[in-house]
Amino acid sequence: MRQATIQRNTLETKIELSVNLDGTGKADLNTGVPFLEHMLDQIARHGLIDLTIKADGDTHIDDHHTVEDIGISLGMALKEAVGDKKGIKRYGHSYVPLDEALSRVVIDLSGRPGLVFKADFTRASIGGFDTELVAEFFQGFTNHAQATLHIDCLRGKNAHHQAETIFKAFGRALRMALEADERMADQLPSTKGAL
């Protein structure tokens, strides 16, 4: 089983995160950031990843450190759980609509961190959650998963729908990239021989 548990403690946050990449989409989330929990549940459900997160952060200041550090921890756990990347598809992509909103996410588990994020949210916050933190979450993830990630919210009028399509599409793209490629067997999906 491709699993990992990360404990990450700083002066700002204490996070314990477990991931099972071959799960069924179960999520047990206690982050202190309700909207983020709703989005993380989308990653688990649509990525068929079991995700357990307990986070204690300085949310009395704001949600920034907690959101960013959960992204970092998820990236670290994914990198550890995926291992040497032999036999995986490596690339994944997904378009996801939700009513008027549509997002596209493309991922490459390349070993090269990079985020291209384009989302013009129609509101600055969703129920107290700053929409700028969506990019912060994914920046933390890409840096520590060592993945290249392109996220485009192509349209939308409702900021909640915009964010939700991004997280759902991310889960589905990640699921595709992590799938076993029987034709690759124990080979790395790269002509370089290393990822």
Swiss-Prot record:
The keyword Amino-acid biosynthesis applies. InterPro entries: IGPD_sf (IPR038494), ImidazoleglycerolP_deHydtase (IPR000807), ImidazoleglycerP_deHydtase_CS (IPR020565), Ribosomal_Su5_D2-typ_SF (IPR020568). GO terms for cellular component: cytoplasm. Pathway: Amino-acid biosynthesis; L-histidine biosynthesis; L-histidine from 5-phospho-alpha-D-ribose 1-diphosphate: step 6/9. It catalyses: D-erythro-1-(imidazol-4-yl)glycerol 3-phosphate = 3-(imidazol-4-yl)-2-oxopropyl phosphate + H2O. Its main location: cytoplasm. Keywords: Amino-acid biosynthesis, Cytoplasm, Histidine biosynthesis, Lyase. It comes from the Bacteria. Disulfide bonds: none annotated. It is an enzyme of class 4 (lyase). Its EC number is 4.2.1.19. One of its GO terms (biological process) is L-histidine biosynthetic process. GO terms for molecular function: imidazoleglycerol-phosphate dehydratase activity. Belongs to the imidazoleglycerol-phosphate dehydratase family. This is Imidazoleglycerol-phosphate dehydratase.
